[in-house]
Amino acid sequence: MVLGKVKSLTISFDCLNDSNVPVYSSGDTVSGRVNLEVTGEIRVKSLKIHARGHAKVRWTESRNAGSNTAYTQNYTEEVEYFNHKDILIGHERDDDNSEEGFHTIHSGRHEYAFSFELPQTPLATSFEGRHGSVRYWVKAELHRPWLLPVKLKKEFTVFEHIDINTPSLLSPQAGTKEKTLCCWFCTSGPISLSAKIERKGYTPGESIQIFAEIENCSSRMVVPKAAIYQTQAFYAKGKMKEVKQLVANLRGESLSSGKTETWNGKLLKIPPVSPSILDCSIIRVEYSLMVYVDIPGAMDLLLSLPLVIGTIPLHPFGSRTSSVSSQCSMSMNWLALALPERPEAPPSYAEVVTEEQRRNNLAPVGACDDFERALQGPLFAYIQEFRFLPPPLYSEIDPNPDQSSEDRPSCPSR
């Protein structure tokens, strides 16, 4: 793109936290500057900003219409959270012939401040998923007579804060499952699993203490394991698309027939993942801890405990500060760097990352028939500017595998 005498057009935000990352919450004031550097005198019709926040989902499904006829069904939905426009220089004008109303900008660097308030109503946390995203951005447009406009778009991050210091998220989570293996007319003893964690809410970087007891009364060698899964759900036109993604796992010791293993606070660390999204009508992001027993030649014995990944960490002694932004900075390692500025080619603005581009960057992944196959899949490769990377490989697994639950007998004597 030829800019002529316009050397650069950039956007900078006034950050509210010590991490120097533009992160905001509902009700915050977003302020910053549009920075313009020119190498000579230019005439300007207007310098505008457009700020917008929205959630959007999109996926396609192939349908069979019969008689060897197939078609593609598109599912799309969008929720807008805010839409703000302002003119920093000049005014709305489409007439290039009139000399009136043009502003002259001299050679050098110039700053133009902008400011707007985010809605007080809850906003969805910024997110980039396989079939949808939640994005917030500011776009600057410099309009000059007889020239194509210079446009630039820069994103900022919004957190809908989740404070894990609430009674519902501090409550312990526990469960028990049992499975009896059958082979033709021979029935072996049961395999039983009990697991408990101290609370439901955690923040990225914390380690979950897992307390579990696994009793193997079967004739097979089994292996106890645990994993954290992220579930992304996308909603459009009355349909739902769900994707499950493995984010962390651990493996216990092999357990022979008649043996019992106890986990007394076995640690599983939560990697730098996106917080839970629970208040968006078209995108939902949830987490769960799967404690399970890998059984060769049979379906795994699986126990699922719900998790909520929050943004405000645990305060065991009740020491709270009034600044939510300062609390947020304690758990923001997953953001690392500010989101980059993204210039666009005139005359129209293209999406930073289109859905088609994301699909082209995805390697095909078949559905997993067994939980263990999913665990052997790729882990979440999380690096600095996570929101504009192609999504990682996903494993779509049955959220309700065939399991049995019976009263727990003791192992038979041998």
UniProtKB/Swiss-Prot annotation:
Detected in visceral fat, subcutaneous fat, brown fat and skeletal muscle, and at lower levels in kidney. GO terms for cellular component: early endosome; endosome; lysosome; plasma membrane. SMART domains: Arrestin_C. One of its GO terms (molecular function) is beta-3 adrenergic receptor binding. GO terms for biological process: fat pad development; heat generation; negative regulation of adenylate cyclase-activating adrenergic receptor signaling pathway; negative regulation of cold-induced thermogenesis; negative regulation of heat generation; negative regulation of locomotion involved in locomotory behavior; positive regulation of hippo signaling; skin development. Keywords: Cell membrane, Cytoplasm, Endosome, Lysosome, Membrane, Repeat. Induction: Up-regulated by fasting. Transiently up-regulated during the differentiation of pre-adipocytes. The keyword Membrane applies. It holds the Pfam family Arrestin_C. PANTHER family: ARRESTIN DOMAIN CONTAINING PROTEIN (PTHR11188), ARRESTIN DOMAIN-CONTAINING PROTEIN 3 (PTHR11188:SF49). This is Arrestin domain-containing protein 3. The gene is Arrdc3.
